[in-house]
């Protein structure tokens, strides 16, 4: 028994900040950002627009796309590292917004790898037979964690949310396989310099960019190779590669090393920037809206995030 995606939806805040606009208050310029990241703009949530609001917008689109009633949902998992509050969870608040009662809801925190982690967790819960319809969300207000004086990090991130509706598959479609990993010894490569039990503040993002690039290439590539080998797949079997949208150089290098053809690689980082756990479901929603995905297509997701956390998943559409 495995789960399948029956609907998806994405949401980006209406405010768009281009590289040129960013350069007005940050020591940077459009050429510097484009060359190093491939990003031209990012969406930024308003002061009173929280992660739960972004999650709600994407969830409603996914529910409509799936053609189900909101009351069909029997579990909510929100993957986020930027909750509205220390507690309760974003998932709990979202449950209230949707008018649902007496169903479980919880947040999952694996940063940029959150959606892949969440997919494996959701699949296990559906496979148990205990849950029939799961709302899985990646939602982030990453700009709330940015130091706008640090041009090495503030240019990279944006806000947004992506949701999928998961149900048990009754044919050969759905999650084929996935793997997830972590390495706590490497946490100082990417972290926030604050936290509730540390100093009572959320802190700002601190990143060792060159080290993170090397780890991303090494770990995502190995994760994908392991999945290919375990399922007796070849790279040519992949119809679409949807990697975490962190940086165009990481995406391009991975595709090159794995020999994945350019037209199969989904890239949204240019317009979305890095939306952390939301980046893969947002990219999936963009691809689905294009009408390109066909039944039976093999989709490959792969991500790496702070922790370090990483993993990959194969889906048959």
UniProtKB/Swiss-Prot annotation:
The EC designation for this entry is 2.3.1.180
Please provide the record's free-text comment about the domains of this protein.
The last Arg residue of the ACP-binding site is essential for the weak association between ACP/AcpP and FabH.
Q: Which CDD domains match?
A: KAS_III
InterPro entries hit by this protein = ACP_syn_III_C (IPR013747), ACP_syn_III_N (IPR013751), FabH (IPR004655), Thiolase-like (IPR016039)
Gene name per UniProt: fabH
Q: Give the record's keywords alphabetically.
A: Acyltransferase, Cytoplasm, Fatty acid biosynthesis, Fatty acid metabolism, Lipid biosynthesis, Lipid metabolism, Multifunctional enzyme, Transferase
| Protein's UniProt name | Beta-ketoacyl-[acyl-carrier-protein] synthase III
In the UniProt record, does the keyword Cytoplasm occur? yes
What do we know about how this protein assembles, alone or with others?
Homodimer.
- Which residue positions does the secretion signal occupy? none
The record's family statement is: Belongs to the thiolase-like superfamily. FabH family.
Q: Could you tell me which residues belong to the region ACP-binding?
A: 245-249
A Pfam family of the record is ACP_syn_III_C
């Amino acid at each position: 028994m495995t789960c399948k995606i029956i609907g998806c939806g994405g949401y980006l805040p209406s405010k768009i900040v281009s590289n040129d606009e960013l350069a007005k208050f940050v020591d940077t310029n459009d050429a510097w950002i484009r060359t190093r990241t491939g990003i031209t703009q990012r969406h930024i949530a308003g002061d009173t627009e929280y992660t739960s609001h972004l999650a709600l917008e994407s969830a409603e689109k996914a529910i409509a796309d799936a053609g189900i009633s909101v009351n069909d949902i029997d579990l909510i998992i929100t993957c986020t590292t930027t909750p509205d509050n220390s507690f309760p969870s974003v998932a709990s608040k979202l449950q209230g917004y949707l008018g649902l009662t007496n169903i479980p809801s919880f947040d999952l925190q694996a940063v940029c790898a959150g959606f892949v982690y969440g997919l494996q967790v959701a699949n296990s819960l559906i496979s148990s037979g205990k849950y029939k319809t799961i709302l899985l969300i990646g939602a982030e207000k990453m700009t709330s964690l940015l130091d706008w004086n640090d041009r090495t990090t503030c240019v990279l991130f944006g806000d947004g949310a992506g949701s999928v509706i998961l149900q048990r598959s009754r044919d050969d479609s759905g999650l084929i396989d996935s793997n997830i990993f972590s390495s706590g010894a490497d946490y100082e490569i990417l972290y926030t310099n604050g936290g509730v039990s540390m100093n009572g503040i959320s802190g700002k993002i601190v990143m060792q960019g060159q080290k993170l690039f090397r780890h991303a290439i090494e770990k995502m590539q190995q994760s994908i190779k392991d999945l290919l080998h375990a399922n007796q797949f070849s790279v040519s079997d992949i119809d679409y590669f949807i990697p975490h949208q962190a940086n165009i150089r990481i995406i391009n290098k991975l595709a090159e090393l794995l020999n994945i053809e350019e037209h199969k690689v989904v890239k949204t980082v240019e317009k979305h920037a890095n939306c952390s756990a939301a980046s893969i479901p947002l990219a999936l929603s963009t691809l689905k809206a294009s009408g390109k995905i066909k039944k039976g297509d093999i989709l490959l997701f792969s991500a790496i995030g702070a922790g370090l956390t990483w993993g990959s998943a194969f889906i048959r559409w």
